[in-house]
Design a protein with these regions (language model features):
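Conserved ATP/PPi-binding loop(s) of AMP-dependent carboxylate-activating enzymes
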Residues: 393-396, 409-416, 425-459, 492-494
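AMP-binding/adenylate-forming catalytic core of the ANL superfamily
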Residues: 169, 324, 442, 447-448, ...
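AMP-binding/adenylate-forming catalytic domain of the ANL superfamily
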Residues: 526, 550-573, 591-597
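A cross-family acyltransferase "interaction/gating" segment
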Residues: 1-43
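Conserved AMP-binding/adenylation subdomain of ANL enzymes
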Residues: 256-273, 281-322, 337
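Conserved pre-ATP/AMP-binding loop-to-beta segment of ANL
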Residues: 81-82, 126, 189-237, 244, ...
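Conserved AMP-binding/adenylate-forming core of the ANL superfamily
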Residues: 85-132, 136, 153-158, 208-212, ...
Length: 598
């Protein structure tokens, strides 16, 4: 088998919806042709062929991600200085052109090279002018921005600061005043003071050079061209759904690879304007809400809080976004509080970070009239792994159509990512399997966690995701749950997510009101406990699930009503918090619904 890499964007690709009848970008284009070992006819199943082609594509893709993020951002900002790069309706400066963003970021970078001696610098700022300038300025200064979550518990926040060796935090004075429970470092720098104390003459000088000098001359005094692509560009922390957050050092290669991978799907049109309120401490918000549009020259429209529906509505009406980035938790909020016609210019909503329920997707489409596309990602993958696409991709013949999306799926893998499915218990590879524990390899995958934590998740260049997936014959990924969200009961693997879906269907409620966890059981190894915000007793639960042919082993033996399920700022369920509630109830025998134990 042969694999061709590097043709996307050429006249032989469907970039822009046209094939062949468009002007070439240049006279020469670097392409890579890769060949696999021969495969006999019996072994050449669709699944096996796909696995081999993905592996060839991943190896070829690595050959073209050798730049660094800071250099690439400087290049794109300087080459088109008059375009609108950022719209921040809540900021002092509502609109920043690319040249203006470049000028202020370079001016601050010069200042921070001298005043910030440490390599990693903490950042606690929302999306917008301040958050963008802080991250880009630190990159230009050769520093590593560490975007931190101010809503973490004090113990988790201290663990993050200690792991990263953070001594200085960039933030706003108002943010520091509001976040009284956050363990601030001894040195806190307010971004508004840094901008105000930068001489106007310095900003004007950098603005003039951005307009007048070619990129090659702009790069010379900065030293950005010498940055190793494999060096750390940004540090994020996992949400810690099942324990303390782990540090994820994302290299320049990781981030640029993911940006290029997403761009080669045709995800964003040239005139797209991305609306984002996702926090910058979230990989989805940092890469897709900041770095991707900067590198790919798309306008960013920001709102500081994803739960501020009034400001989101104002931004959507005033600034004509075409793409909205969000999570299912926030999309539920918009469905309830954003007026029907506020998103009139949106062409698509892109959902990530957690599984998008079919009912929510249908309701969003019915209310706002735009496509709702689901993707799958991981902080360790910088973050996008797979994505459903808007339109069917047409082949050369009119009859040839490759559909870009599939209901209920997380889409196909991005180009440049290889996958294999493992047995969840033995971790043995199962070539050609339809279902298993997902392992990934690609230029966007990190080499390991900070401080060599959880080394067992990285094996021979592969990252073991912890997600159990099913892959259909067309290559679409269907997420079945975290391997940690399966319980082995009486020798049978039971999916917590599947039980939650059955409960939501049985009680005609919205998903997200229930969490099923497994706790030790002396008889069967584990038993299921249901945490719910609904008013359900155990007998009603048993009766409703049994009537839907749900196996008895799958029916939770204990029901605990809670006013609210533990969750993080991103909307993701705090599984560790849920488990603690279940274990506490089991240990203390707190009051539960009448018939908890069979």
């Amino acid at each position: 088998m042969a694999h061709l890499d590097g043709l996307w964007g050429s006249i032989y690709s469907f970039e822009g919806g046209r094939y062949f009848t468009k002007l070439p970008r240049g006279l020469r284009r670097r392409t890579t042709v890769s060949f696999s070992a021969p495969l006999n006819a019996e072994a050449a199943t669709t699944r096996r062929v796909r696995e081999i082609l993905l592996t060839l594509g991943e190896a070829a893709f690595r050959l073209r991600t050798g730049a660094n993020l800071a250099k690439r951002i400087l290049k794109t900002l300087s080459e088109d200085p008059f375009r609108t790069a950022l719209v921040d309706p809540t900021g002092d400066t509502k609109t920043l052109r690319a040249g203006e963003l470049l000028a202020i970021s370079r001016a601050l970078a010069q200042r921070w090279k001298r005043s910030l001696p440490e390599r990693r610098v903490g950042v606690i700022l929302p999306p917008g002018t301040a958050g963008t300038i802080a991250n880009i300025g630190l990159l230009f200064a050769g520093k590593v921005p560490v975007n931190l979550n101010p809503t973490l518990s004090e113990s988790a926040a201290r663990a993050c600061l200690k792991q990263a060796g953070i001594e200085t935090i960039l933030t706003g004075a108002l943010i520091q005043t509001k976040c009284t429970k956050f363990p601030w470092t001894s040195r806190v720098v307010h971004i508004e003071n840094e901008i105000a104390n930068t001489p106007r003459s310095r900003k004007l000088r950098h603005l003039a050079t951005a307009f007048l000098l070619p990129t090659s001359l702009l790069l010379r005094p900065t030293g950005l061209g010498k940055i190793d692509p494999d060096s750390e560009a940004a540090l994020l922390f996992t949400s810690g759904t099942s324990g303390l957050p782990k540090g994820v050092p994302l290299s320049h290669r990781n981030l640029l690879a993911n940006i290029l991978q997403v761009s080669e799907t045709g995800f964003a049109d040239k005139d797209d304007r991305l609306l984002t309120a996702l926090p910058l401490f979230h990989s989805f918000g940092l890469t897709m809400g900041l770095f991707f549009p900067l590198v790919m020259r798309r306008t960013i429209i920001t709102v500081p809080s994803p739960l501020d529906c009034d400001k989101l509505t104002e931004a959507a009406r005033a600034d004509a976004p075409t793409v909205l980035l969000a999570t299912p938790t926030f999309l539920r909020h918009y469905l309830k509080w954003v007026p029907r016609h506020a998103f009139g210019t949106l062409r698509r909503m892109v959902s990530g970070a957690e599984k998008l329920p079919f009912e929510l997707r249908t309701a969003l489409h019915a209310r706002f009239g735009c496509e709702v596309l689901e993707g799958y990602g991981l902080t360790e993958a910088a973050p996008v792994v797979s994505l459903n696409l808007s339109m069917p991709a047409r082949g050369i013949g009119a009859e040839t159509i490759q559909h870009g999306s599939s209901d209920g799926s997380a889409g196909r893998l991005l180009p440049g990512i290889a996958m294999k499915l493992l047995d969840p218990e033995t971790l043995a590879e199962a070539p050609g399997a339809q279902r298993g524990l997902l392992a990934l390899r690609g230029g966007n995958l990190v080499a390991g966690y900070l401080g060599e934590q959880a080394k067992e998740k990285f094996r021979d260049g592969w990252y073991i995701t912890g997600d159990v997936v099913r892959v259909d014959d067309s290559g679409f990924l269907f997420l079945e749950g975290r391997v940690s969200r399966f319980s082995k009961i009486g020798g049978e693997m039971v999916s917590h997510g599947a039980v939650e879906e059955a409960i939501a269907e049985a009680f005609s409620g919205q998903p997200g009101q229930d969490c099923v966890v497994g706790v030790p059981c002396p008889d069967k190894g584990e038993e299921l406990v249901l945490l719910t915000t609904r008013s359900i007793d155990r007998e009603a639960l048993r009766r409703n699930l049994a009537s839907r042919a749900v196996p008895n082993l799958w029916i939770p033996r204990t029901v605990i009503q809670v006013p609210q399920l533990p969750a993080f700022a991103s909307g993701k369920l705090d599984l560790a918090g849920c488990l603690k509630l279940a274990e506490k109830a089991a240990a203390e025998r707190l009051p539960r619904s009448p018939a908890c134990i069979d």
